[in-house]
């Protein structure tokens, strides 16, 4: 068997190693100047006013919800077709996740579904920019504004994603992820952008013990007077070791996403006559970042189940992923919310499969995946 082809692999090279050496030699390896540079770079990338680097997008979601005052008795609208950390954070704050269905073909929430789920207890809406495509954020934001409800964009998949000519996160509040499989990575990390000055200040405090300044600020400006806790907070700051990696990855993002697009376009062309159906791309003006390439494997049409297909591809040395198993079908949420029924989410959650997609894939790697799928489809 050929070498195993994973569904994702981070693209790291000499520039990342040099950036790490620079930080290690500097004597300041935790939150410091590289964080500040990363935050400034994301303000430039998105056009938003504030950027706050954090240790993960999950931590970013936690402190953003908390900074908005989300707590017991509140409801937060979210798709079930998302990574479970969002729902976990809502529940850990004592609020209730209100899971809504997604469009059957692009797997993102719609303004109509959001509108139908709003109650007097709704305090936030969390649309997900999915697989590298943008949600119809103008329409969703309009619903939030009409009801006075905050919108938090889950942009974990959206580094390099554009909506109507602007980078996702150019206004409002959005949360990006730098996890190992993302379009740009620093192993673990995340970043929040916002145009709300007060919210940015609260998030900065909450992500570092509830203090008004971080360790680098105190080192730079002196320790007198001693920083005080403004409100109890967490330790979600990003180390400069990670921020240095993220800065190099950001420089490579455009080129990396171009390669992702080339691979995705080959999949679209060369699998078009197979029964493996990809997600549809949004009808609104956008630039896709192709974080994931997802097919739907319907046993009735394909002659094989999704799980069986993944096993056969694994036996052929090809890795795949599942993004995501719907949250409401998992034990805790299934038992807590037994009444939730989301037909589009459930149909897709049982059939979606993420194919290998990362910038360092060779043309031969792509051919190998396509050939395997054509073989398994009988084409």
Curated annotation (Swiss-Prot):
A Pfam family the protein falls into: DegT_DnrJ_EryC1
Modified residues (N6-(pyridoxal phosphate)lysine): 182
Molecular function in Gene Ontology: pyridoxal phosphate binding; UDP-4-amino-4-deoxy-L-arabinose aminotransferase
SUPFAM superfamilies assigned: PLP-dependent transferases
Lineage top rank: taxon: Bacteria
Catalytic activity: UDP-4-amino-4-deoxy-beta-L-arabinose + 2-oxoglutarate = UDP-beta-L-threo-pentopyranos-4-ulose + L-glutamate
Pathway: Nucleotide-sugar biosynthesis; UDP-4-deoxy-4-formamido-beta-L-arabinose biosynthesis; UDP-4-deoxy-4-formamido-beta-L-arabinose from UDP-alpha-D-glucuronate: step 2/3; Bacterial outer membrane biogenesis; lipopolysaccharide biosynthesis
Cofactor: pyridoxal 5'-phosphate
Tagged with keyword GTP-binding: no
Annotated keywords: Aminotransferase, Antibiotic resistance, Lipid A biosynthesis, Lipid biosynthesis, Lipid metabolism, Lipopolysaccharide biosynthesis, Pyridoxal phosphate, Transferase
GO BP term, pick one: lipopolysaccharide biosynthetic process
EC assignment: 2.6.1.87
Enzyme class (EC, first level): transferase
Annotated GO CC locations: membrane
InterPro entries: ArnB_NH2Trfase, DegT/StrS_aminotransferase, PyrdxlP-dep_Trfase, PyrdxlP-dep_Trfase_major, PyrdxlP-dep_Trfase_small
Subunit note: Homodimer.
HAMAP family, A to Z: ArnB_transfer
Cited NCBIfam families: PRK11658.1
Role summary: Catalyzes the conversion of UDP-4-keto-arabinose (UDP-Ara4O) to UDP-4-amino-4-deoxy-L-arabinose (UDP-L-Ara4N). The modified arabinose is attached to lipid A and is required for resistance to polymyxin and cationic antimicrobial peptides.
Similarity comment text for this entry: Belongs to the DegT/DnrJ/EryC1 family. ArnB subfamily.
Protein name, entry field: UDP-4-amino-4-deoxy-L-arabinose--oxoglutarate aminotransferase
């Amino acid at each position: 068997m050929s070498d195993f082809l994973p569904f994702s692999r981070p693209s790291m090279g000499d520039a990342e190693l040099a950036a790490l050496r620079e930080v290690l030699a500097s004597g300041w390896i935790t939150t410091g100047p590289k964080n500040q540079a990363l935050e400034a770079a994301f303000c430039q990338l998105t056009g938003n006013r504030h950027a706050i680097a954090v240790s993960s997008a999950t931590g970013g979601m936690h402190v953003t919800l908390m900074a908005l005052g989300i707590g017991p008795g509140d409801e937060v609208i979210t798709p079930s077709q998302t990574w479970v950390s969002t729902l976990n954070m809502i529940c850990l704050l004592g609020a209730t996740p209100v899971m809504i269905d997604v469009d059957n073909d692009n797997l993102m929430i719609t303004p109509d579904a959001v509108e139908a789920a709003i109650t007097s207890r709704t305090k936030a809406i969390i649309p997900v920019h999915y697989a590298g495509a943008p949600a119809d954020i103008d329409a969703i934001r309009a619903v939030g504004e009409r009801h006075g409800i905050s919108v938090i964009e889950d942009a974990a998949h959206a580094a390099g994603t554009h909506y109507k000519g602007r980078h996702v996160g150019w206004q409002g509040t959005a949360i990006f992820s730098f996890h190992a499989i993302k379009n740009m990575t620093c192993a673990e990390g995340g970043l929040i952008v916002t145009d709300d000055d007060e919210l940015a200040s609260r998030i900065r405090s909450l992500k570092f013990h509830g203090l008004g300044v971080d360790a680098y600020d105190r080192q730079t400006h002196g320790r007198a007077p001693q920083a005080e806790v403004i409100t109890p907070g967490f330790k979600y700051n990003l180390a400069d070791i990670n921020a240095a990696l993220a800065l190099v990855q950001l420089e490579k993002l455009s080129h990396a996403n171009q390669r992702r697009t080339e691979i995705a376009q080959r999949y679209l062309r060369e699998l078009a006559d197979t029964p493996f159906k990809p997600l549809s791309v949004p009808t609104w003006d956008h630039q896709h970042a192709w974080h994931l390439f997802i097919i739907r494997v319907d046993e009735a049409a394909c002659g094989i189940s999704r799980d069986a297909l993944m096993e056969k591809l694994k036996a052929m040395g090809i890795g795949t992923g599942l993004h995501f198993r719907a949250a409401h079908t998992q034990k805790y949420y299934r038992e807590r919310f037994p009444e939730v029924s989301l037909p589009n989410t459930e149909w897709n959650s049982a059939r979606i499969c993420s194919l290998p997609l990362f910038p360092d894939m060779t043309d031969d790697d792509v051919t190998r995946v396509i050939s395997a799928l054509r073989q398994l489809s009988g084409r």
